[in-house]
Amino acid sequence: MSENPKRRSRRSVLQFLGRGIIGGMVFAECVGIDQLCDGPRAWGTSQQKPDSKSQAAGDYSSFGKQAAEALRKAIRFFATEVAREGGYVWTYSADLRFRQGEGRASETTVWVQPPGTPAVGAAILRAYERTGEEEYLEAARKAGECLARGQLESGGWTYRIEFSPDARRRFFYRTRPRNEKGFNWSTLDDDTTQSALRFLMELDRVLGFGNELIHECVQYGLTRLLAVQYPCGAWPQGFREPPDPTAYPVLGATYPEEIPPAPNFKEYWRFYTLNDQAHMDTIRMLLLAAKIYGEPKYQKAAEKGGEFLLLAQMPDPQPAWAQQYNFQMHPAWARRFELPAIAGGESQDVLRVLMTLYQHTGREDFLAPIPRAVGYLKSSVLPDGRLARFYELKTNRPLYFTRDYRLTHDDQDLPTHYAFKVENCLPEIEVQCQRLRERQQPQSLRETPGPHLPPRPSLSAVERVIKTLDDRGRWVEKGRMETAGQSVGQVIRSQTFIANVDILSAYLAWLRSA
């Protein structure tokens, strides 16, 4: 098959903002660490700051009936008019004639990559747990069964699922028709397989582990994910089958003697990958699996993933992390704008997940790399207060690409599809690490799986969400669909649906708890 497990398509900043919240109730508990500095996880988060003026001016329950009706109308519209085969894409024209994910989508295509089917399904599932409305559980179940029908034989998912007979024949799905010669690369890129499993695990829990299709899909996916973990604890970006453990020695990270001037390995998705938080998302997902199923093997695999991060910390003078490593544990090329270098964004997410692992295990070695890494990264902050996405190996000079992909130290002609500067979250990371060392860490990560009271939304946010919903149950907004083939001025976004459903359901959960 010609489809690349890591397509060279356009990326937006949303891909660096959009995970975590789709993991459902339990996964959202990680917010204390994993959303430091707003972190890399923010699809639909409803953590608005309280609006003291609006709440002082009126009773917090004043929008109760309106919120319940708006939530019902919005979910019903998405589940009955927007969904295809129970699944969703990213963006729709207001009249639903055009659909797209990261690329154009047909009437029989749904998207897995956030904010696609798992993200929408998880928001609806949270709404069910917060309100008890059976209609929402049915919509979430359909989204889950849609994902189950798109699971590849390799155990995970690629970015989209096809449902037309002709298109399905190009993939090796586990469900019929099965094509053993079809595309069978599962991807951990952009939180794709991880988000599907997180949602399906939460759905499995809510359904009491009684839906055979959902439960078996999760168990198969988790089993295959454990099987493709390398001996060193890393995962590839994409996988079809387990690696031969004898072919991949366990090594610590070192600097290469020479850096190839351009990408020099065709199937770079086999490399040990931290890029776009792939490794860290996988660890978080396995910690959730350990909580939901009580299986030590998932915790063990997550810890092994953490041990890889200890191995992957570069030696001085740059004790942080690269986006990807080759099998000699040297920072390596991926795409032509993802080079062997220290990565400012991924390094911060490594620090977050190491703290999460410490919370789950109490293992001091997961905190040990943090002071050196933070000290180094603080010394590398740019004049504008941010961090560079890439720092040149050994020299530590910031690296950028021009719009025509020439490597440079100058930041004046950057492409717009990729963030070459990232937010500096080091102060928050330092504070959290100190609290953990003082045993002041939150205990929520050790709680039992299940719904917990979400952050309380402000009345002004609730009012805004209600007022912007139209009579059909749509949140229509200005926007462009570049793949529609013609100008589209008004769109419906799954990202907006997720955010607004979370606000309404969180508000109703607070009213129920009063």
Predicted features along the sequence, with ranges:
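C-terminal segment of N-terminal export signals and the immediately downstream linker at the start
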Residues: 7-8, 28-58
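Short amphipathic alpha-helical segments enriched in leucine
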Residues: 18, 75-79, 83, 125
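Terminal, non-catalytic domain-edge segments
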Residues: 49-77, 195-220, 262-264, 284, ...
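Extended ligand-binding groove/face enriched in aromatic
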Residues: 82-280, 299, 315-338, 384-419
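Substrate-binding/active-site clefts of carbohydrate-active enzymes
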Residues: 312
